[in-house]
C-alpha cells in the first residue's frame, strides 16, 4: 500500500510536493477509511487536481520514474521475455526553468506498506547518478524501527538485517543499491518483501489512453462494477447500468442504460 510520496525538482515540479494517503483525524466517512494492523488510518482513494498544464501528471510520472529506476535493472537481468516491454527507461529530469535547479538533483521519498512492515525509501538522483539512498523499516507486528542501509557518494553502510550482506567495490553510481540487492540477494526475505511491493504492489494506468481506461471496465467482478456505477452516479450522470463487450479483434464496445 502506498502511504506517502514526496518529490522535489522534477520536470515542472520545482518545490517539494507530497502526495499523502494518510487519513486526517476527522469523523466523517470513518467506514471508508482503511485501518492498518497497527491502528494507522489510510485513504482508499485520493486525487490530484488543478488546472490544465499545472503539473498533475508529473506527480504520478515522478512516482513511476522512481519505481522504474529501481525495477529496470532487475528486468534487465531477468530471463523472462514477457517483461521486456516493461523495461522502458524513464528519464529523471530536473526543473528546467531555473539556472540553479537545472543543476540540482531530483529528490524522492516514498513510504509504503506490505503485510509485514512499513518502509521509507529515499533516493536523490542527479543526471541518473545516485547521490544519496536510504532504506528504513518499521515492523508492523512489533513497531520496531530499524535502518537497513544508507548510501552517499563516499560510502555504503548496510545495517540491521542487512548488516551481513556484502556489496561490490565496483557498484555503478547509476545503479540503485536496492536494485543491486534485488539482483544479488533475491532470496533474502526483506529484499523480496520490499521489491515485491515495487513490482506488484503498485500499478500505473494511462488515462490518456481511452482504450486502456475502457479495459478497466471489462472486469468480471460485480464488486468492481458496483463501485464504478457508484462513482458515475456521484458525478450526477444519468447512467444506471453498463455492459462492456470485447470482440475478436480486441475492440471494446460499451453499452449504457440511462434513467
Regions found by a protein language model. Give the residues of each.
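Conserved ABC ATPase signature
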Residues: 44-51, 247, 251-259
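Short acidic, glycine-rich loop/turn motifs
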Residues: 7, 11, 110-116, 137-139, ...
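Conserved P-loop NTP-binding catalytic core
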Residues: 41, 47, 61-120, 126-127
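Pocket-edge structural micro-motifs
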Residues: 21-23, 180, 256
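Generic structural "secondary-structure junction" signal
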Residues: 15, 97-99, 132, 180
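Beta-strand secondary-structure signal
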Residues: 4, 18, 107-111, 120-122, ...
Amino acid at each position: 500500500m502506498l502511504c506517502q510520496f514526496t518529490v522535489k525538482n522534477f520536470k515542472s515540479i520545482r518545490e517539494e510536493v507530497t502526495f499523502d494517503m494518510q487519513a486526517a483525524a476527522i469523523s466523517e466517512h470513518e467506514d471508508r477509511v482503511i485501518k492498518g494492523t497497527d491502528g494507522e488510518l489510510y485513504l482508499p482513494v485520493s486525487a490530484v487536481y488543478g488546472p490544465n498544464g499545472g503539473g498533475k501528471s508529473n506527480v504520478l510520472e515522478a512516482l513511476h520514474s522512481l519505481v522504474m529506476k529501481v525495477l529496470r535493472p532487475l528486468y534487465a537481468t531477468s530471463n523472462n521475455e514477457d517483461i521486456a516491454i516493461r523495461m522502458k527507461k524513464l528519464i529523471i529530469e530536473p526543473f528546467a526553468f531555473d539556472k540553479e535547479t537545472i543543476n540540482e538533483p531530483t529528490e524522492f521519498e516514498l513510504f509504503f506498506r506490505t503485510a509485514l512492515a512499513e518502509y521509507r525509501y529515499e533516493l536523490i538522483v542527479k543526471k541518473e547518478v545516485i547521490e544519496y539512498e536510504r532504506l528504513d523499516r518499521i515492523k508492523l507486528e512489533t513497531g520496531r524501527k530499524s535502518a537497513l542501509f544508507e548510501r552517499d557518494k563516499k560510502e555504503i553502510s548496510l545495517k540491521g538485517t542487512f548488516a551481513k550482506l556484502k556489496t561490490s567495490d565496483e557498484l555503478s553510481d547509476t545503479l540503485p543499491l536496492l536494485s543491486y540487492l534485488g539482483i544479488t540477494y533475491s532470496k533474502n526475505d526483506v529484499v523480496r518483501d520490499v521489491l515485491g511491493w515495487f513490482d506488484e504492489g503498485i500499478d500505473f494506468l494511462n488515462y490518456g489512453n481511452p482504450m486502456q481506461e475502457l479495459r478497466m471496465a471489462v472486469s468480471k467482478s460485480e464488486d468492481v462494477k458496483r463501485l464504478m456505477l457508484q462513482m458515475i452516479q456521484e458525478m450526477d450522470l444519468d447512467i444506471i447500468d453498463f455492459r462492456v463487450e470485447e470482440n475478436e479483434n480486441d475492440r471494446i464496445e460499451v453499452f449504457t442504460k440511462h434513467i
